[in-house]
Curated annotation (Swiss-Prot):
Protein's organism: Human immunodeficiency virus type 1 group M subtype C (isolate ETH2220) (HIV-1)
Location of region: Interaction with host PPIA/CYPA and NUP153: 187-225
Disulphide bonds in the chain: none
Pfam families in the record: Gag_p17, Gag_p24, Gag_p24_C, Gag_p6, zf-CCHC
Organism domain of life: Viruses
Motif (Nuclear export signal): 16-22
Keywords noted in UniProt: AIDS, Capsid protein, Host cell membrane, Host cytoplasm, Host endosome, Host membrane, Host nucleus, Host-virus interaction, Lipoprotein, Membrane, Metal-binding, Methylation, Myristate, Phosphoprotein, Repeat, RNA-binding, Viral budding, Viral budding via the host ESCRT complexes, Viral nucleoprotein, Viral release from host cell, Virion, Zinc, Zinc-finger
Lipid-bearing positions (N-myristoyl glycine): G2
UniProt protein name: Gag polyprotein
Length: 504
């Protein structure tokens, strides 16, 4: 069908275009807003033809109003547009959108008051405080709990097996019930007899505590008065249905049904704790677990904790952040202690996914690279050596970048025919002496040792056999003169090692 702009014509269209979008604003409603509303209704699976009449607009308002608190801005804008259009159809004079919303609220309040008055008149005729109702004769009679309620209760116990949500379900189904009705609900539970025995023990303990705090008055009961209920009467074991109704509807009333229900809920809390053995301290977020799933497990376990609301609030503020994984914990601590649960879940959305892992890895690699660069820079700190050109002899550039005419020959000695790396010009060695030396030997060689020469043939002695003593392996002892001569041969090492203490 497409979007339509023919919803309003004539006077209604003029009135529509005079209404401002905001109080004190300059912009007014136009035909394009009706076209947009048509398209948005199709998105919400609503019939756009409902905009043609005031009754249709009222139906749209009833459909959209429950979702306003959790809806998007588009939903709120659509609701405001339909509310304004409803006022135009009803010919209600308004100046802006806020006045239209106020008119809608006034009509809804008036309709609600009429409904309450009609309901109160009907209740005054036939019933008071279900399941105890008043019959036509004005007597208070009991309506048994329905089979549908019992079936819902049994189904919850079988499916949930005393999980934390069983307690609110029991509270809702047992609203206004008598002790007899409550016993009927407990007796319909076929399985979990160990849990039911624990519940009976808790009820007996509470009944004994009631008897201790409310002792029996001495003497007979005055005529026309009801006796005070005992613990067993509240539990429905020693009292009749008529007595229970009389206590609950008396003046002053004794709410035996509510008291008994409170005892049962206390026992159910113990059973829920037994069926949920996991402590709130053990609920920790896994390394790859989404934060939303972790929050669900946390509050499900917190629901089973036997603690006051203040303690549970402290657990939520402290343990929820403390037991999160390192990635979420870093984000939550950055939000601060006053962050709401919605802000936490929004901030941690996507943590643990591929995109988040890639971002974390990139940040880690960036930090490693920065650290490496800083270490490399720190290793080469110190005064910089000035570079010198071998061609022109000036500092600040190298020979390959020199603009001066290239010097011919060796850059060291100035002679042609060889390069500087092959230059044989004398240069100082590590002892500070010029090398090559004209004397032949460097300073760290023996200088005064005579060169060995062969004697003339005329002076050569005839070879004779050595004496027998020379074959003995004896240690030769040098003479003092020979030792002094050897020491004098080492005098040239003074330049290297200083004074020789052996000569002193």
């Amino acid at each position: 069908m497409g979007a339509r702009a023919s919803i309003l014509r004539g006077e209604k269209l003029d009135a529509w275009e005079k209404i401002k979008l905001r109080p004190g604003g300059k912009k007014h409603y136009m035909l394009k807003h009706l076209v947009w509303a048509n398209r948005e209704l199709e998105k919400f699976a609503l019939n756009p033809d409902l905009l043609d009449t005031s009754a249709g607009c009222k139906q749209i308002i009833k459909q959209l109003q429950p979702a306003l608190q959790t809806g998007t801005e588009e939903l709120k804008s659509l609701f405001n547009t339909v509310a304004t259009l409803y006022c135009v159809h009803q010919k209600i004079e308004i100046k802006d959108t806020k006045e239209a919303l106020d008119k809608i609220e006034e009509e809804q309040n008036e309709s609600q008051q009429k409904t309450q008055q009609a309901g109160a008149a009907d209740r005054g005729k036939d019933s008071q405080n279900y399941p105890i109702v008043q019959n036509m004769q004005g007597q208070m009679v009991h309506q048994p709990i329905s089979a549908r309620t019992l079936n819902a209760w049994v189904k919850v116990v079988e499916e949930k097996a005393f999980s934390p949500e069983v307690i609110p379900m029991f509270t809702a189904l047992s609203e206004g019930a008598t002790p007899q009705d409550l016993n009927t609900m407990l007796n319909t539970v076929g399985g979990h007899q160990a849990a039911m025995q624990m519940l009976k023990d808790t009820i007996n303990e509470e009944a004994a505590e009631w008897d201790r705090l409310h002792p029996v008055h001495a003497g007979p009961v005055a005529p026309g008065q009801m006796r005070d209920p005992r613990g067993s009467d509240i539990a429905g074991t020693t009292s009749t249905l008529q007595e229970q109704i009389a206590w609950m509807t008396g003046n002053p009333p004794v709410p035996v049904g509510d008291i008994y229900k409170r005892w049962i809920i206390l026992g159910l809390n113990k059973i829920v704790r037994m069926y949920s053995p996991v402590s709130i301290l053990d609920i920790k977020q896994g390394p790859k677990e989404p934060f939303r799933d972790y929050v669900d497990r946390f509050f499900k376990t917190l629901r089973a904790e036997q603690a006051t609301q203040d303690v549970k609030n402290w657990m939520t503020d402290t343990l929820l952040v403390q037991n999160a994984n390192p990635d979420c914990k870093t984000i939550l601590r950055a939000l601060g202690p006053g962050a709401s649960l919605e802000e936490m879940m929004t901030a941690c959305q996507g943590v643990g996914g591929p995109a988040h892992k890639a971002r974390v890895l990139a940040e880690a690699m960036s930090q490693v690279n920065n650290t490496t660069i800083m270490m490399q820079k720190s290793n080469f700190k110190g005064p910089k050596r000035a570079i010198k050109c071998f061609n022109c002899g000036k500092e600040g550039h190298l020979a390959r970048n020199c603009r001066a005419p290239r010097k011919k020959g060796c850059w060291k000695c100035g002679k042609e025919g060889h390069q500087m790396k092959d230059c044989t010009e004398r240069q100082a060695n590590f002892l500070g002496r010029l090398w090559p030396s004209n004397k032949g030997r460097p300073g760290n060689f023996l200088q005064s040792r005579p060169e060995p020469t062969a004697p003339p043939e005329s002076l050569r002695p005839e070879p004779t056999a050595p004496p027998p003593e020379s074959f003995r392996f004896e240690e030769a002892t040098p003479s003092p003169k020979q030792e002094l001569k050897d020491r004098e041969a080492l005098t040239s090492l003074k330049s290297l090692f200083g004074n020789d203490h052996l000569l002193q």
